[in-house]
């Protein structure tokens, strides 16, 4: 639905255990990917919330991707966590040592719940989902793409600032979180050529043998920005007209 609540909101700082646990649990239940950045280090790592318990004041994060980020956890280095849930940015600082343990037989990092969480609703960047019958073909390529040849996939949804992509099979080992790929192309009717994108989210869904990637547009030209905004506006109009309740 489209109303004034979709307008941008200033960030809020959540400080009560109830609010913090509720928002972290949303990230857990939706399996929303997290971006982890260690202070004074350029690499980004991906994880997920796997356990939230307000009663015992504990939080557990899934094993990091790539795994080599674990050595920074072992060193007790501080880091920042950032996730997105339904257009809301949820972020916090981890400034204490975490314990490497297991939850349901899977490796994880556990510690206390954060004392503060930043909650920032960013609905102003309308994200338009494409119907399955209308998915746009995309090509992802660039100097830092691992493996042989460009990657071909589908555009699932798009906003003025980024888009979600789908690739057949497990392609996680070909991509690096935080990396910029300079040759992203999208077929008609969007028609983007050699656009720069930054990889923000990456998740392989084994059940359907599909990899999902979230990218943010990087240094867009004026022409590309206008193409994207026009395409989003077109999708927005169609969504209002045909599928109000679905968007």
Swiss-Prot record:
HAMAP family per the UniProt record, alphabetical: YcgR
Any one GO cellular component localisation term in the record: bacterial-type flagellum basal body
GO BP: any one term: bacterial-type flagellum-dependent cell motility
Subunit structure: Interacts with the flagellar basal bodies. Monomer. Binding of c-di-GMP produces a dimer to monomer transition.
InterPro entries assigned to the protein according to its UniProt record, in alphabetical order: PilZ_domain (IPR009875), Split_barrel_FMN-bd (IPR012349), T3SS_YcgR (IPR023787), T3SS_YcgR_PilZN (IPR009926)
Function: Acts as a flagellar brake, regulating swimming and swarming in a bis-(3'-5') cyclic diguanylic acid (c-di-GMP)-dependent manner. Increasing levels of c-di-GMP lead to decreased motility. Binds c-di-GMP with a dissociation constant of 165 nM. Binds 2 intercalated (c-di-GMP) dimers per subunit.
GO function terms (MF aspect): cyclic-di-GMP binding
Name assigned to this protein: Flagellar brake protein YcgR
Gene3D superfamilies to which the protein is assigned, alphabetical: Electron Transport, Fmn-binding Protein, Chain A, predicted glycosyltransferase like domains
Localisation per UniProt entry: Bacterial flagellum basal body
Effect listed in the UniProt record for changing residue 159 to A: 4-fold decreased affinity for c-di-GMP
Effect of residue 122 to L: 4-fold decreased affinity for c-di-GMP, binds 1 c-di-GMP per monomer
Domain PilZ: 121-234
């Amino acid at each position: 639905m489209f109303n004034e609540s979709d307008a941008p909101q200033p960030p809020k700082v959540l400080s009560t255990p109830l609010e913090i646990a509720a928002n972290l649990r949303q990230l857990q239940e939706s399996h929303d990917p997290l971006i982890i950045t260690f202070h004074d280090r350029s690499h980004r790592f991906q994880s997920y919330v796997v356990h939230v318990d307000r009663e015992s004041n504990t939080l557990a994060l899934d094993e990091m991707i790539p795994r080599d980020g674990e050595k920074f956890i072992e060193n007790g280095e501080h880091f920042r966590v950032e996730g997105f849930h339904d257009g809301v940015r949820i972020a916090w600082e981890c400034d204490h040592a975490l314990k490497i343990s297991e939850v349901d037989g899977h490796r994880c990092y556990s510690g206390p719940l954060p004392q503060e969480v930043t909650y920032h609703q960013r609905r102003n960047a309308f994200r338009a989902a494409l119907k399955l019958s209308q998915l746009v073909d995309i090509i992802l390529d660039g100097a830092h793409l691992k493996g042989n040849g460009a990657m071909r996939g589908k555009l699932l949804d798009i906003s003025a600032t980024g888009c979600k992509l789908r690739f057949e099979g497990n392609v996680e080992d070909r991509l690096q979180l935080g990396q910029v790929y300079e040759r992203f192309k999208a077929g008609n009717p969007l028609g983007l050529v050699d656009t720069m994108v930054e990889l923000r989210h990456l998740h392989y869904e084994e059940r359907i043998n599909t990899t999902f990637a979230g990218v943010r547009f990087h240094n867009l030209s004026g022409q590309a920005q206008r193409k994207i905004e026009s395409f989003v506006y077109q999708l927005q109009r169609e969504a209002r007209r045909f599928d109000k309740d679905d968007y």
